[in-house]
């Protein structure tokens, strides 16, 4: 799995709301503050003792793509090593229930036709999701080319695509160009599945609340 990248406070908010264990490689000052203040279970490759165990660096990626794109992990490694950390809670907290409900196997989504979805993130990054009726998945492209699984060489496909509308702004005084992204409150959005789209409303009461 990778490359594992640096944390931002809005990632931490989403992880906390889903009672997740958060793995990252470095992070913004705001992300570290959020991890410390909100009590997120986090493992950091850059400022922690986990490189060479939970994480490792791929030297070929480091040479060809840069240091920040070289950190990897795997599901097998995570499952094997997490129980060895005695301080870590491996079960969901009392009362936690997964907040989102998707279709059961064999059910088909209803809505207006949506065979291709183009999502512009910035002037240089646009995500495209093209519905493939044979697989029932949206095939992912970015930077004008297929987004490929490095293990299989196949184009990545996803069943569900959620587009959430929220406020995004540059952090005042941040020389690195980092952004503030609202993850709490409510907002409108779109849900794409099975080549169809439905309008939705999302909600997240506070940082510790799940996204619904």
Placement of each model-derived feature along the sequence:
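A surface/extracellular/periplasmic glyco- and lipid-processing/surface-interacting theme
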Residues: 2-212
């Amino acid at each position: 799995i990778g490359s594992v990248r640096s944390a931002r406070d809005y990632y931490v908010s989403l992880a906390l709301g889903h009672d997740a264990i958060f793995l990252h490689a470095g992070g913004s000052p705001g992300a570290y503050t959020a991890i410390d203040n909100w009590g997120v279970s986090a493992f950091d490759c850059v400022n922690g003792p986990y490189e060479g165990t939970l994480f490792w660096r791929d030297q070929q990626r480091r040479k060809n793509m840069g240091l920040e794109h070289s950190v990897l992990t795997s599901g097998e490694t995570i499952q094997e090593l997490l129980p060895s950390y005695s301080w870590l809670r491996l079960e969901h907290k009392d009362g936690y229930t997964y907040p989102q409900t998707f279709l059961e196997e064999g059910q088909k989504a209803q809505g207006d036709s949506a065979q291709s979805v183009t999502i512009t993130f910035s002037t240089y990054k646009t995500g495209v999701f093209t519905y493939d009726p044979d697989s029932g998945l949206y095939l992912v492209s970015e930077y004008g080319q297929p987004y490929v699984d490095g293990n299989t060489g196949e184009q990545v496909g996803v069943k569900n695509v959620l587009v959430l509308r929220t406020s995004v702004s540059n952090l005042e005084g941040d020389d690195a160009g980092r952004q503030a992204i609202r993850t709490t409150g409510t907002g409108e959005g779109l849900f794409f599945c099975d080549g169809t789209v439905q309008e939705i409303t999302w909600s997240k009461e506070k940082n510790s609340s799940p996204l619904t």
